[in-house]
Every structure is written in C-alpha cells, then in structure tokens.
Curated annotation (Swiss-Prot):
Classification lineage: Bacteria, Pseudomonadati, Pseudomonadota, Alphaproteobacteria, Hyphomicrobiales
CDD domains: CobQ_N (cd05389), GATase1_CobQ (cd01750)
Family: Belongs to the CobB/CobQ family. CobQ subfamily.
UniProt-annotated catalytic positions: 333, 430
Statement: the UniProt record of this protein carries the keyword Metal-binding: no
Annotated protein name in UniProt: Cobyric acid synthase
Gene3D superfamilies per UniProt: 3.40.50.880, P-loop containing nucleotide triphosphate hydrolases
Length: 483
C-alpha cells in the first residue's frame, strides 16, 4: 500500500482542502506520483469525476493539483445535505439512498469496507497519498464507527497532522484542547501540527509554537501565512460565501440569492475572476441589489424547499421587478427548474410538497424522476455558437414551449430554454462559465467587455503560487518523511 499522511483539522473550514491541494502540487513538483483521498465528505458542491460518478469538488481540485484524472475512489463516501435531518448518501460515486442522523451513525461501520477498498485503489501505483479528514477528530460523540478522521487513521495506520486556523482566533486552545480530548489511541496517531492563515510577522508566534509543543508533545511543521492565491481557487464550503462583501462598483453586478441548500456554487468562480464583474452573494433577509444587470439562480440540492425559501425572502417579487427593469436572469440546474411555471414531484423525492407553482419566468414545467443524471458533457452554446464543457448532476425532466429556444446543444439533444426576448435563460449545465470564449461573448451581450483571462490557466497559476507558499513556510521534508 502507498505511503500516506492524513491532515485533520481542529474544526471545519480551517483550510484542509486547500492545504491538501497545495501539498499535492508540491509533491507533484518534486516528481512524486501523488493522489488525494478523503474518506467522507459532506458537501453539496459536487463534481462529476473522470470515471463518471459524484465526488466532492475539493477532491476534483486536488486531483487537478496532482495532474491525474479524478476518480470516485478519491472520495468514496459523499453526503449531500438535502434536509435539516438527512443527506443523500453517495458511495463510490453512486446514490445509495438517504442517510439520517442515528441511522447513518449505525451505517458507518459498514461503509468502512468501501472506504478501505477505495483507499487501496487510490494508492495503487502511487508514491504518496495525501488524506483529508472532515470536521474535527475531537467530536467524541461521533467517534464510534468513525470513518472520516481517527477511525480511518487508526484502521489504515496513517499518521496524522493537525491543522489549526489562527485567523478565527483561539488556535492554541483548539490544538491543546484537541490533545486533551483525544483518547490515547487516537492521540498516538498525531505526529505534529501546523498553523494556517497567519497574518503579520510570523516570528511573533514562535513562543506560541513552543508552548503548543510543550503542552502536547507534538512538533510544529510550520506556519502558513495568508496566501492570496487561495482566493483564486474554488471554495468547497458555502460558509465562505457568507463572508463576501461588496467591493468597488464594477461594470456588471451579478446578484446570487444564497439559497439554504445552494450547490455547485463554484459555477460562479470564473465570473468572480473577471475584472469588470462583481458577484454579490445576497444572504437571506437582504434584497437583491437594484443595480444588478444579471441575477443567477444557482444549483440547489432541494429545488422545491429552496423555491419556498426564495419566496419567503421576497426574492420572487424582486426578480419580477428586476426583469421589468430590463435585467437578465440565468437559472442553473435547480435554478433553471425554479424559473418555470410548475415543478411536480409525484413520488415525493424531495419531500412532502408534491406540486408547486414556479416563478413563471420561463414557459416550462419540470417533473422529478428517481433516476439521477450524472455526466460530464461537451456542448455547443446556441446563444453564441461557442463550445462548452460542463457537467450535469440533476433529477427531473423539463419540457415546454420555451425549450424550442434551447440554451445549448449536447450531442443529439438540446439543453435548457431561453425566453422569447432572450433575457431569461436556463440550463442544466454546470461549469459553463469556465469556457473562456463563451464567457466573454456572454458578458459582451450584457454590455461588458470581458477580459482575455484564461480561467483554467488562472487556476493552474494559483495552484503553483500556493505550492510555492507552502514550500517556503512548511517543513515539507519533515512532513513527507512521516509517510
């Protein structure tokens, strides 16, 4: 089995995903055959892997950093929250049903076999596997049957490095507290720690590093400064969206309602990277900006529930006002379904609401179906006759008069719909704005001269800068020697 190192955090959103992506690129730059692995992920920000299943978007990015095709085995267990009490369970890329609270806790030991099978497949032929944990290993209420953190590490005998986030404060207490809470068997798996997201003079933290080592016995592998390259990489968690603030006025304002179960929000990243575009994430309780030229209704894990939430916030009325002012609207996947006259869910796939009136901005209707469409696609934009590469992850079939004006052509069938005046658009395709020529033409049609940015190259450049920053700030030789 390949050598491996596992990175666990003192909590969620400490930066594990990006750190692992950066370290994957570091290892690749050093000539190692490196692979990413995350036993269990909880995220609605999913990707379609190169072998045709669903994985966390973070593992897709990590595979890119490794320079290898993504695989369902890089993230064998994916939980996609769809209600407050339950998540859709994806095992090795395929839907296995719904996981609810206590039932899932009882199911986890059975999933360890799939996790270990995938871990072996990922490690086959690799020099190094970099493993990412989930949340915190100190959640002792979740330790029994754990497959995400120490349960996996002890089962697979993989050494652990703890990651602490100093930007949120309390990093010393987080690390020392984790040491205190962990049972002896788990504590013995930890070989050291690193500090992430430091701002200012790092030398001022030297005494604190020594104190953490004194309290825990763990060595420090370094302090990672706040790296600007991180902001140019796709974020995994919607919590990052909540921190977005408006900047200087740009030529085009793109407003995005923050739906409770927003999914695949990295669709927006190429727009955010355009110098003339400002993407405004609109939180619940706030109004859509009146100066927006485009409103994007994003993907969602629960279309009907999020449509109800959209109405509760008054965004439906604001959308109508936006259209009357001459604004444009783009619905992606679940957002596309919302734009129609009606959504029917006769089998109750999404919940108890079996039929709901849509926003009525497109003359279409959607019927949910049990079979889930999961695939990477090559398409042609029928708006601008430009090639597109994207992916579909959805349930439901949409039909209606406005489908006669499709958004794109995928092989032998059409996708999406466009209103007669061309200002309301919908598509099932995720990732369309990553296509540079399409994005530039799309923005030009909205009165904005798009730049010459190559989005994929910009992501590669950001990964390169991230790797350089980690090489400069961490004891990479010491880290890799753990495996």
């Amino acid at each position: 089995m390949a050598r491996a190192i596992m990175f666990q955090g003192t909590g969620s959103d400490v930066g594990k995903s990006v750190l692992v992506a950066g370290l994957c690129r570091v290892a690749r730059n050093r000539g190692l055959k490196v692979r990413p692995f995350k036993p269990q992920n909880m995220s609605n920000n999913a990707a379609v892997s190169d072998d045709g299943g669903e994985i966390g978007r973070a593992q897709w990015l990590q595979a890119l950093a490794c320079g290898v095709p993504s695989s369902v085995h890089m993230n064998p267990v994916l939980l996609k929250p769809q209600t407050d009490m339950g998540s859709q369970l994806i095992v090795q890329g395929q839907v296995r049903g719904e996981a609810r609270g206590r039932y899932y806790q009882e199911l986890k030991p059975q999933l360890m076999a799939a996790v270990m099978e995938s871990f072996a497949k990922v490690g086959d032929g690799a020099d190094l596997v970099l493993v990412e944990g989930a949340g915190s290993p100190a959640e002792i209420n979740l330790r029994a049957g754990d497959i995400a953190n120490m349960g996996f590490a002890t089962h697979a005998d993989v050494p652990v490095v703890l990651v602490g986030d100093i930007d949120r404060g309390g990093v010393i207490a987080s690390l020392v507290g984790t040491h205190t809470i962990l049972p002896q068997e788990d504590r013995a798996m930890v070989r050291g720690f690193l500090i992430n997201k430091f701002r200012g003079d790092i030398s001022l933290f030297d005494d604190s590093l020594a104190a953490i080592t004194r309290f825990t016995g763990w060595r420090s592998f370094g302090v990672v400064p706040w790296l600007k390259a991180v902001s140019r990489l796709p974020a995994e968690d919607s919590v990052v969206l909540e921190r977005a603030v408006r900047g200087d006025k740009k030529a085009l304002i793109v407003a995005v309602p923050m739906l409770p179960r927003i999914a695949n929000f990295d669709d927006l990243d190429p727009l955010k990277a355009e110098p003339a575009v400002e993407v405004v994430m609109v939180p619940p309780g706030s109004s859509l900006p009146a100066d927006a030229g485009l409103v994007v209704l994003p993907g969602t894990k629960s279309t009907i529930a999020d449509l109800l939430a959209l109405r509760e916030n008054g965004w439906d009325r604001e959308l109508v006002a936006h259209v009357k002012r001459g604004g444009h609207v783009l619905g992606i996947c679940g957002g596309f379904q919302m734009l129609g006259r009606r959504i029917s869910d006769p089998a109750g796939i999404e919940g108890n609401v079996r039929d709901i009136e849509g926003l009525g901005l497109l003359d279409i209707e959607t019927m949910t179906e049990p079979e889930k469409v999961v695939r990477n696609v090559e398409a042609v934009s029928l708006l601008h006759d430009e090639p597109l590469e994207g992916y579909e992850i959805h349930i439901g079939r949409t039909s209606g008069p406005d489908m006669a004006r499709p958004f794109a052509r995928i092989g032998d069938h059409d996708d999406g719909a466009v209103s007669p005046d061309g200002r309301i658009m919908g598509t099932y395709l995720h990732g369309v704005f990553s296509a540079d020529r399409f994005r530039h033409h799309f923005l030009r049609a909205l009165g904005v001269e798009g730049g010459q940015m190559n989005y994929r190259e910009s992501v590669e450049e950001a990964l390169g800068e991230l790797a350089e920053g980690l090489e400069a700030s961490l004891d990479i030789d010491g880290l890799f020697a753990l495996a």
